């Protein structure tokens, strides 16, 4: 377990950053390229551990994939061309890989076994395996398909109309991907609209997807046609530097090519509500995934209440929003965020525990947290618990804290932002 020591930043963070490729879009580009007909070229791919797990799984199923830094070429096999893997498909730490790939495996007639690391072994799979079983896939796992390893034998699926108890893009995507080869029209209805990268990218690959309110539908029997994909920067990775720019004194940062998909920009809405000083300049009007350059500078933030429909649009940003709230005047309440409990760690507990070690006044609630600003943070030894987003949030906190902060298990950030610490160092000069 590697540790990193963060020293306080005295002269602010200043400069330009090109944010690495969006993790959600990178995963999907590889998967959809693999089941499309023809050659897909992906530019701006995120070469983090999670997305590399997706590549290795599809290579194991006979797909020809060449990755060179942030450029990837996938020679698609079509929906019916995947081969039975000879080895166990290992997703590493990636919840996106296991859940979306389960939807694809559910419509293949061969046998496969899927597993991941210790964190994946604790994450609930039944929310995906149950609807896939209803469609006719044979899936088993520990505790009746609740936990990995999962065994899947697919094929001969029937479409379903599924009402999901949670707003989860992974659940929705798995069902839609299974529906590509199911008989009939597959429909998924959610309590709130979750991120829609799957729908946007399926359309880019030539699949007709219908959206009506909180319901998404597609008819079985459609083929994917290869297309080139330009991946914008990941707004979830940008969030750490957006908050850093707002809370670290004497800072001004320009974040380039940040993905601005409206189902993902809750962090932008929250910073606006907290009175952060920033500008957004759109750069690729009309693209299937919009992007912008964002300039942010040191701001006087105020506490707010965050809950309801916005939560699925910022669920991954809550750790760093909590940090921002420690530097805001007044109280910030985050609620309706039960999903935090089933992320890489229980992010309610880990955020509260680690920020408390740094001197923040913050308490856990059943569905979120209450943060009392403004707190003077003091350096300490903290732990990421192997969770990339906790690790990056603590690094930004360390820049602000008095004295040095040591982060244990700091290499976890490589899952989504392999160059994070180098970028942070460059901006402090």
Swiss-Prot record:
It is found in: Cytoplasm. Pathway: Metabolic intermediate biosynthesis; chorismate biosynthesis; chorismate from D-erythrose 4-phosphate and phosphoenolpyruvate: step 6/7. It is an enzyme of class 2 (transferase). PROSITE patterns: EPSP_SYNTHASE_1 (PS00104), EPSP_SYNTHASE_2 (PS00885). Gene3D superfamilies: Enolpyruvate transferase domain. GO terms for biological process: amino acid biosynthetic process; aromatic amino acid family biosynthetic process; chorismate biosynthetic process. GO terms for molecular function: 3-phosphoshikimate 1-carboxyvinyltransferase activity. It catalyses: 3-phosphoshikimate + phosphoenolpyruvate = 5-O-(1-carboxyvinyl)-3-phosphoshikimate + phosphate. The keyword Transferase applies. GO terms for cellular component: cytoplasm. The active site is at residue 316. Phosphoenolpyruvate binds at residues 23, 95, 123, 170, 347, 389. SUPFAM superfamilies: EPT/RTPC-like. The keyword NADP does not apply. Keywords: Amino-acid biosynthesis, Aromatic amino acid biosynthesis, Cytoplasm, Transferase. Its EC number is 2.5.1.19. Catalyzes the transfer of the enolpyruvyl moiety of phosphoenolpyruvate (PEP) to the 5-hydroxyl of shikimate-3-phosphate (S3P) to produce enolpyruvyl shikimate-3-phosphate and inorganic phosphate. Belongs to the EPSP synthase family. Monomer. This is 3-phosphoshikimate 1-carboxyvinyltransferase.
């Amino acid at each position: 377990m590697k540790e990193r020591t963060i020293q306080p930043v005295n002269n602010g963070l200043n400069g330009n950053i090109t944010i690495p490729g969006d993790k959600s879009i990178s995963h999907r580009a590889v998967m959809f390229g693999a089941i499309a007909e023809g050659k897909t070229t992906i530019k701006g791919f995120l070469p983090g551990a999670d997305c590399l797990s997706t590549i290795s799984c599809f290579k194991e199923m006979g797909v020809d994939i060449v990755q060179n830094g942030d450029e990837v070429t996938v020679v698609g096999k079509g929906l019916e061309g995947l081969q039975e893997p000879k080895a166990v498909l290992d997703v590493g730490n990636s919840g996106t890989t296991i859940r979306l790939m389960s939807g694809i495996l559910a419509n293949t007639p061969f046998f496969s076994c899927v597993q991941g690391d210790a964190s994946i072994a604790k994450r609930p799979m039944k929310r995906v395996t149950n609807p896939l079983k209803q469609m006719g896939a044979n899936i088993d796992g520990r505790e009746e398909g609740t936990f990995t390893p999962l065994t899947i034998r697919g094929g001969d699926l029937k479409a379903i109309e599924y009402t999901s108890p949670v707003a989860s893009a992974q659940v929705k995507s798995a069902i839609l991907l299974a529906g590509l080869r199911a008989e009939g029209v597959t429909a998924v209805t959610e309590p709130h609209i979750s991120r829609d990268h799957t729908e946007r990218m399926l359309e880019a690959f030539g699949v007709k997807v219908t959206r009506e309110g909180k319901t998404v539908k597609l008819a079985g029997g459609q083929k994917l046609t290869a297309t080139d994909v330009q991946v914008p920067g990941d707004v979830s990775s940008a969030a750490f530097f957006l908050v850093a720019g707002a809370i670290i004194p004497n800072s001004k940062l320009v974040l380039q090519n940040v993905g601005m998909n409206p189902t993902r920009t809750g962090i932008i809405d929250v910073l606006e509500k907290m009175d952060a000083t920033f500008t957004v300049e759109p750069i690729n009007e009309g693209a299937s995934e919009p992007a912008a350059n964002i300039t942010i500078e040191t701001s006087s933030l105020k506490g707010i209440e965050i809950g309801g429909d916005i939560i699925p649009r910022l669920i991954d940003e809550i750790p760093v929003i909590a940090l921002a709230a420690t530097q805001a005047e007044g109280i910030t309440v985050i609620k309706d965020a039960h999903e935090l409990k089933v992320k890489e760690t229980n992010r309610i507990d880990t955020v509260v525990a680690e920020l408390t070690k740094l001197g923040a006044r913050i308490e856990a609630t059943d569905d979120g947290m209450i943060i009392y600003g403004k707190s003077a943070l003091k350096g300490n030894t903290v732990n990421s618990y192997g969770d990339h987003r906790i690790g990056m949030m603590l690094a930004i906190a360390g820049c602000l804290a008095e004295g040095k902060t040591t982060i244990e298990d700091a290499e976890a950030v490589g899952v989504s932002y392999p160059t994070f610490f180098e970028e942070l160092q460059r901006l402090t000069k």
